[in-house]
Amino acid sequence: MNHYLNAFLRSIIEAVTEFLPVSSTGHLFLFSSFFPFSGESLEFDDLFDIFIQSGAILSVLFLYREKFGSQMLSSFQYLTKRNSDSQGFYFLVQIVIGAFPILVVGFIAKKFLDTIKARPDLLDILASAWIFGGVLILIAEWFFQKRQGTEEKKTVGFRDAILIGIFQCVALIPGVSRSAATIVTARFLGKDTKSSAEFSFFLAVPVLLAAGIYKLIKHRSILNEVTIPILAFGFLISFLLCTLVIRLFLRYLQKHSFGVFGIYRILLGVGVLVFTKFIR
């Protein structure tokens, strides 16, 4: 397959799955298992995934530029005693608190996680994680149907940020999905669908940014006149499509729950298990 066509298809997969609770990493691995970049190393695959994830980060910063800008300005004014309003400062602190656990655990458990990703039965692990996550999403939606009439909370507090950040660590297991872990936790804490999704978006920024910087430094030796245009192409496509997907996702959540993503995960997981056990 042509490198640019491969990059285009991977960018579409990243854009559609990064902020949905379905595991973008799992989908990208599934695709690359059948359609790898011909002639390129695994390091290039890894770096390309980081570039398209960076495009996803930029889409969040672009869509929420006014919110991030005002919160950062408010934080600066609060810290320099020019403003007594602490809301912006505490918002940024919550993002840091929520991102901190997965950054620490990811660093400590890096070798173990790399071992999991190198296992020959990784597709089975992904399938199991898809099914398990799908069941959890359906349980969460059932839980909220039982709570009909109870007011859902739109504000994420410090306790919420800590708990969401802790459970986000589960997403280090391939196939679990960072979005699923954060959204499901937020829902069990009583947050409405939009607030759950948006806080998940915000948490993605420091987490994916840290991973991106680390891997860019690690794989900088493969940057050259051949690879850079492909990486830049994937970054641009991911940014443009992710911007559209986030808008459509939030519009969808105005009238629907996360249940359909739970069903999708279960069906995908079962399909992959059937393939690995009976077809491959």
UniProtKB/Swiss-Prot annotation:
It holds the Pfam family BacA. One of its GO terms (biological process) is regulation of cell shape. Belongs to the UppP family. Its main location: membrane. This is Undecaprenyl-diphosphatase. It comes from the Bacteria. Catalyzes the dephosphorylation of undecaprenyl diphosphate (UPP). Confers resistance to bacitracin. The keyword Cell inner membrane applies. The keyword Membrane applies. Its EC number is 3.6.1.27. Keywords: Antibiotic resistance, Cell inner membrane, Cell membrane, Cell shape, Cell wall biogenesis/degradation, Hydrolase, Membrane, Peptidoglycan synthesis, Transmembrane, Transmembrane helix. Bacitracin is thought to be involved in the inhibition of peptidoglycan synthesis by sequestering undecaprenyl diphosphate, thereby reducing the pool of lipid carrier available. It comes from Leptospira borgpetersenii serovar Hardjo-bovis (strain JB197). The chain crosses the membrane at residues 19-39, 44-64, 89-109, 125-145, 156-176, 197-217, 226-246, 259-279. It is an enzyme of class 3 (hydrolase). It is a multi-pass membrane protein. InterPro entries: UppP. GO terms for cellular component: plasma membrane. GO terms for molecular function: undecaprenyl-diphosphatase activity. It is found in: Cell inner membrane. It catalyses: di-trans,octa-cis-undecaprenyl diphosphate + H2O = di-trans,octa-cis-undecaprenyl phosphate + phosphate + H(+).
